[in-house]
Design a protein with these regions (language model features):
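Short, proline-enriched alpha-helix->beta-strand connector loops that line the catalytic pocket
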Residues: 226-231, 265
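A domain-start/cap signature at the N-terminus of enzymes
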Residues: 27-97, 112-115, 128, 188-212, ...
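Short beta-strand/loop motif that positions the catalytic acidic residue
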Residues: 233-235, 239
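Serine-hydrolase catalytic machinery in alpha/beta-hydrolase-like enzymes
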Residues: 67, 71-85, 92-186, 196-199, ...
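Short, glycine-/aromatic-enriched active-site segment of Class I SAM-dependent methyltransferases
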Residues: 246-253
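Bacterial N-terminal signal peptides
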Residues: 10-21
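Bacterial N-terminal signal peptides that target proteins for export
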Residues: 2-12
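Conserved alpha/beta-hydrolase "acid-adjacent" motif
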Residues: 241-245, 259-262
Length: 293
């Protein structure tokens, strides 16, 4: 990999789940299709988050660990997000920030559920703040929400919702209430949320140090990052919703999705953008999964 400078160093990783014969992660244990079905089943059983005892729209600085719910207006639309401030947080000591985005048809509550992703528990162990924004939803409950990640997905794309502007505004507002290390802001997401994480790497490269996309490829319509951003793609070979080799996956509403960019093409784009060397290095190789850097 080509090194530019310590401040401009960027990393590109591709983790591929090649089969369901072994595991190095939860995703490796099932095919992508069955994994999504399990997520839908859980969503049907429970829609709440683990953010018990939320404080809604607190004014001023946040000084105590806990769970917080916020609303803000952007482009004339009321947007919502959940914030978890970890037990290790100390005012005056800037903490890293993770923006975690739900998949298409999901919600911030579902993404925040520790039963589903464990991000709140991880936040408490590692000491980073995690924020769960909600996409655009046709329902007051915020369920069935989508992100405008470029060519996907659903109502957010069709209405050309400014999700990039919302995320920037959310981070700016949050940084006024908690002490965030602006050099350690990261994004991750599942499926449509993963696609959105990649768009943030393109459009908010001045904000994000690194992004990780699970089951989401690069479906941006334009991408001109002002600096390298480390990118991680985690994808199943047999994903039948966002196919590894690109194209349309299985869905009940074809018009809600797109012809997805393949994983190899997505990786190739970021190799060029980040000035990485053309030959990948295998850094993980286990039954069922491998990772190239």
């Amino acid at each position: 990999m080509k090194r530019m400078s310590a401040s401009r160093f960027a990393l590109l990783l591709l983790m591929v789940i090649v089969a369901s014969t072994g595991s190095v992660s939860a995703l490796a244990q099932d095919s992508a299709g069955s994994f999504r079905e399990r997520l839908r089943a859980r969503m049907a059983q429970k829609g709440g988050s683990d953010a018990a005892g939320e404080i809604v729209n607190p004014a001023g600085k946040i000084t105590q660990p806990g769970n917080y719910r916020f609303t803000l207006e952007h482009d004339g639309i009321e947007r919502t997000y959940l914030v978890h401030v970890p037990a290790k947080y100390q005012p005056g000591h800037p903490a890293p920030l993770l923006v975690a985005m739900h998949g298409g048809g999901g919600s911030m509550e579902y993404q925040a559920s520790d039963d589903n992703y464990g991000q709140i528990s991880k936040s408490d162990r590692e000491g980073f703040i995690v924020v769960f924004p909600n996409g655009i939803s046709p329902l007051k409950s915020g369920l069935l929400a989508t992100w405008n990640a470029g060519t996907c997905c659903g109502p957010a794309r069709d209405r050309n919702i400014d999700d990039v502007g919302f995320i920037r505004k959310m981070i700016d507002k949050l940084s006024q209430q908690v002490d965030i290390d602006r050099q350690k802001i990261f994004a991750t997401g599942m499926s449509n949320g993963g696609l959105m994480a990649i768009r943030l790497a393109c459009d908010l490269s001045d904000v994000f140090k690194a992004v990780a996309s699970v089951a989401g490829t690069d479906n941006t319509t334009h991408c001109n990052p002002t600096r390298p951003v480390s990118v991680l793609f985690i994808h199943a070979r047999n994903d039948d919703h966002v196919p590894f080799e690109g194209g349309r996956g299985k869905t009940r509403r074809q018009e809600a999705v797109t012809s997805f960019t393949s994983v190899p093409e997505s990786v190739s784009r970021w190799v060029k953008r980040n000035g990485c060397g053309p030959e990948p290095k295998r850094v993980l190789d286990k039954p069922g999964a491998y990772c190239d850097r």
